[in-house]
Amino acid sequence: CSVMYILCNEEPLWMSKYLSVGGHFEYKGSWKKTTLSRLNLCSENSELEQKARHFDGFNSLYLYRRWYRCFTTLSSYSFDNGHVERKDDLSLDHFRSQYDGKGPVLLGKLAESWPARTKWSMQQLVHDYGEVTFRISQRSPKKIIMKLKDYVSYMELQHDEDPLYIFDDKFGESAPALLEDYRVPHLFQEDLFDVLDYEQRPAFRWFIIGPERSGASWHVDPGLTSAWNTLLCGRKRWALYPPGRVPGGVTVHVSAEDGDVDIETPTSLQPLECTQLPGETIFVPSGWWHCVLNLETTVAVTQNFVNQSNFEHVCLDMAPGHCHKGVCRAGLLAVPGKSVRDIENHPPGTITSNHNDMTCTEERLKGSGSVRDSNSESQCSSFEFSDVDKSLENQVFSYDIGFLSQFLEKEKDHYTSVWSPTNPIGQREAREWLRRLWVLKPELRGLIWKGACLAINVDKWYACLEEIRACHSLPAPSEDEKLPVGTGSNPVFIVSDNVIKINAEGGLGYSAHGLGTELEFYDLLRKVGSPLVNHIPEIIASGFLVYEDGVYRTVPWNGKGMPDVLAKYYPLELSYANSCFPLGLWSKQQFGMDGSAESSNRPIWPYMVTRKCKGDIFAHVRDTLSKADLLNLASSLGVQMRNIHLLPLPHEESLPEPEDNNVKDSDPPEWKQVISTLNRRKNNIKKHLANWGGTVPTVLIEKAEEYLPPDMSSLIKFVKDGDGDSVYTFPSWIHSDIMDDNILTQRAPEMGSLTDTKSTGDGDLEKLNEILIIDFSDLSIGDPLCDLIPLHLDVFRGDIDLLREYLGSYQLPFLRGKSNDDIYKSVQNSKFSTASYRAMCYCILHDDNVLAAIFGLWKELRNATSWEEVEHLVWDDLNRYQQSSPTLSS
């Protein structure tokens, strides 16, 4: 019992328990007391005040060593053998030529004039910011925040083996005055991420406070950025390894799935070491491994940055695949399928810093042994490579971008590959970043082009653009037009007044059906004379781009008939090969039911050229519009969405039966693909919701299956009163992607403000605030409520006034069928017909994380205990509209 008591009182155990809970942190003198208090498991005067029990005769060397590490002092540690150079008054040219991208350096006199030198003492910080909460760095995924005065109290009381420390990237928001106390040193003022808006750019600056024994374990800075760190108080001990030499005992995880090769390094090389003193700034180049240990209580500020020296490395790290990521960090150990046998019998040594000319000997990947400032092979260890192809057998590791780019996985493409979660910014943000750099920094276009080729394969897609342009006699792109635009899922170029979109997302089968369905949709619009044609782009050309024998060629196609090129490269087995639009809507529905995934990348891509629409993308101008303007826009959207949902479906072909056993024979064929998809997601609903990474409260995940109908066909099938016959609703065309970046808004100059005139009819409304809807590549059929989800959550941002204005001009019932009277009668007694319930079900089962938008817009719903609460707050207005909405004549 005594042993169990001792082990159960271990502080790391209680610390882990507390950190798993998260929240606001107030230290009670020990982690056990702090955790029990946080969980309300003891009163202030009971367990917390009891004296610790002592047991004679119990010994544990393991626990003693831990205890020793918790109470040891480092303040007298002053060893520094000068591995890292110290320099004062470096010019920018000297820094760039001698150190930037080459090796670390300690810099003095950069912070002499900072107010922080005097204002960032612990006493003054507590006086000025004691009540401000800061983020705490720790291993738990839970967020820990703490008032500064409470953290200082923790520092004074704690004896943790690995103490918590403040590592806050949001300090500029919680304590903006801190930003005025320092300025970025002149050597590091170039940061190519600064073309992004603050909300778009990755975390880049941190305010750091840590006690003795705290610090950061071995790591490479995110995205292969470089960093500077200025110490204001205390002393820090740094250890560093150059790129490709993994510290002993460190395992690098780089998986093929998320880009993040398990590599256990055999190296026992001694690192570069230095002690950083108050007022000194250390520069850590891109790709360098480093760890930090606080010898005293320290206060520091650090920033990561992208400049011309590391730009290509940052872009390379964003490229799809994992091999190059591993090589950048672990050297040739990361080459897949290669084994490395360490040749030992060499004494351990140190790395010496020779920044100007790293010799081939020093660049060679080494194991147990020394790297000395010498060219003698006899002084260095080496590796023998077993089963290595001849091209790598005698390779010498280099951090040069030409060497590293050899390890890119050529078959992977930016637009068709999974984006690594370890990348510092998102996939779409990366394209936006490169585009902004291209426009705003024309003097760097040579460098930016190289980076874009690495990150997003821009050379490949530009070659595609050139072939399409030549085929259709389009003007040549200007220098400003050479990079893709927009944040969509496919490469899009704007050349003069033309928009060229190359469909790459989802593989050839998916993209070919997307193009075929879009062309069929346009054909239907013209046949029925829909007014929607005035609010969508005009198609100029379409077809397929084929790559064979090292050359691109185009095959024009208008959607009608099966192109020979598909039969050669992708022999689709289609039920509609002889129909007018063989890759149209019904073929797309069948393709979706088959669930067939692309087995490999094929050298063929559909494309479409449209006339560039006049107007501004709504996402870019929404913040400049008045509420009245937004109401007019919502009303215009209602009119155009009505036009989309009223468009008749193509002539129905006989659809093969889906494999989903939950899809009944009696279900209408046009609904079977929708029902099959919804049932498939419902059957894995907990896993589906868990994929959103903590977005959805756990209590709601547990209740999702109970909330959803047992059969998803219940959302479109109702029982008519009287004889009990089933009544089915009609599906509608669904745009599927009505987001703020797919809406263009245009002011009428002669009308002045959008609010100057009250519209009296549809014509006046369109003249007042004309909108255009773009990107119909995700067209499908289904419940028209599905289009309302992105509209309300993304375009309207949950604004109920905009939703009501939209519904006021939409003027269509949500449920339509052969007999709207029968539909109206049958829904009176059906829970599943309630508009708010159906909308909530579609949100839960959505293939995008729309629930993140809901819990972001209505933060109070993070504490909801039932889906009904969420449904009523977000979607209740739909029920009032449904009860009063007009019915169309049968």
Question: Residue ranges of each PLM-predicted region?
Answer:
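ATP/Mg2+ or Mg2+-diphosphate-binding catalytic cores
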Residues: 846-890
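ATP-dependent phospho-/nucleotidyl transfer catalytic cores
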Residues: 622-631, 658-733
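N-terminal accessory scaffold of Fe(II)-dependent oxygenases
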Residues: 2-281, 291-458, 463
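ATP-binding pocket architecture of kinase catalytic cores
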Residues: 480-675
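Intrinsically disordered, low-complexity domain-flanking/linker segments in eukaryotic proteins
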Residues: 359-361, 365-381, 546-598, 657-664, ...
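Juxta-kinase regulatory segment immediately upstream of eukaryotic protein kinase catalytic domains
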Residues: 457-480
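Active-site activation/catalytic loop segments of kinase-like enzymes and analogous catalytic loops
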Residues: 785-824, 842-862
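Active-site acidic catalytic loop and adjacent metal/ATP-binding pocket
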Residues: 482-496, 606, 644, 698-788
